Structure formats: structure tokens, C-alpha cells
Amino acid sequence: MSIHIGAKKGEIAETILLPGDPLRAKFIAENFLENIECYNEVRGMYGFTGSYKGKRISVQGTGMGMPSISIYVNELISDYGVKNLIRVGTCGAMQEEIQLRDVILAMSASTDSNMNKLRFGGMDYAPTASFRLLKKAYDVAQEKGILTRVGNVLTVDTFYNEDVNSWKKWAEFGTLAVEMETAALYTLAAKFGVDALTLLTVSDSLITGGQTTSEERQNTFMGMVKIALELAE
């Protein structure tokens, strides 16, 4: 066991899906995996291991934000030997051509957080995805006919920003969408020499103010999860 994960050694697969919501982790396990076993309920942050098309895979809730996902990613890699970490979540679109329910593959992640500035002595670091996972996910999406967009996303520390226009400068530089975890995930993957990728479903648009319904989010989320599950090795 690690501090925040109750699993024993060997109970977590080398490839893991990381939704922020622990109930979404439970949904993925119960609806997509076979022979599932729950290895974690610590703090209500569910973790499951099962199989998908004969390949062993795990799914673990991470909570919201860079500090929370950093805890789970550190322990999954250091204590359980996870090699492929795939975040599946939602985001807000920053570009006019991006529609609700589109799927985004995060090639890289900018951030307004000071986490990496503290780590790198005030200098910037460019967190990037695993090219191997990125290419494979894109190819799978093409095969399944799922429209995907690939590019930079913005990882933010605050969900409710007092400056409602702060996103516009990022959009000017081509940033596709905003979310809250990817920069931390990619930085830690680089530190430990493992592979990581974020897949995001567009749940709302900062351009139009449009939002998806819970049913629409669920239906689109399932397509994204099907892409992510194909990355199991």
C-alpha cells in the first residue's frame, strides 16, 4: 500500500486510465472492463483493475487539479510501476472551430500554475505528451471515425477565475482548450520516464457559452474512453 492508494503490489496494471471523478472510474470499470476488482476505496477515490479485449488495464480516480492528480500519479509510478497513464476528462473550448462534444488529444500543456516554476527555479518547462500514445490514439480515433483535434491545452489552478477574459490571450496563441490536470501529469511522466496522454471531451465553449447536457457528456465520454482503452498493451 501507498499513502493514498490501498492496492497491494501487482494489483494495478501497467496501463491506467485516470478520470478525475471517482464515480466515473467506477462507471468505466463496470461498463467497459471484464473481471474487475476494486483495489482502492481510500478517501472514496475508487480504483479498479480488469481486462479489455484480453488486455489488463486499470482505472483510477484522481480528484480535481494539479496537486490532487500529482499525488496519485507519483504513487502509481513510484509504488506500483505504472508505465502508461491516460487521463480522460472534460474541457472548455477556446477556439471557434471547436464544437461541443469534440474530442481533444493534448499534445502539450501550458499552465498558469506556479508548480513548475518552483520545480525549475523560476524557469518555464514545456510538458508534452508521449508521442507513442498520441499517435496511437489518433490512429484509433481515425479508424473509429471519431473526430479529434490535436494541440496545446491550458492547465489552470482555478476553476472560477475572477478575470473572465484571462483565457483570450492563450487563445490568441492557438491553445485549444482549458482544463486542470494535464501539465502536472505530463511533467511527472517526464520526470519518471513513463508515457502519458490526456484525452478530453469538450463539455462547454468559452467562445459561445454553450454547454453540453449530462446525457450528451456521457455519450461523448464513452467514445473517448473507447479510444483510451485501445491504448492498453
UniProtKB/Swiss-Prot annotation:
Keywords carried by this UniProt record: Glycosyltransferase, Transferase
Enzyme Commission code(s) on record: 2.4.2.1
Residue sites binding phosphate per the record: 20, 24, 43, 87-90
Keyword Glycosyltransferase attributed: yes
Reactions that this protein is recorded to catalyse: a purine D-ribonucleoside + phosphate = a purine nucleobase + alpha-D-ribose 1-phosphate; a purine 2'-deoxy-D-ribonucleoside + phosphate = a purine nucleobase + 2-deoxy-alpha-D-ribose 1-phosphate
Pfam families: PNP_UDP_1
General function of this protein: Catalyzes the reversible phosphorolytic breakdown of the N-glycosidic bond in the beta-(deoxy)ribonucleoside molecules, with the formation of the corresponding free purine bases and pentose-1-phosphate.
Family: Belongs to the PNP/UDP phosphorylase family.
Protein name as catalogued: Purine nucleoside phosphorylase DeoD-type
Source organism of this protein record: Alkaliphilus metalliredigens (strain QYMF)
Gene coding for it: deoD
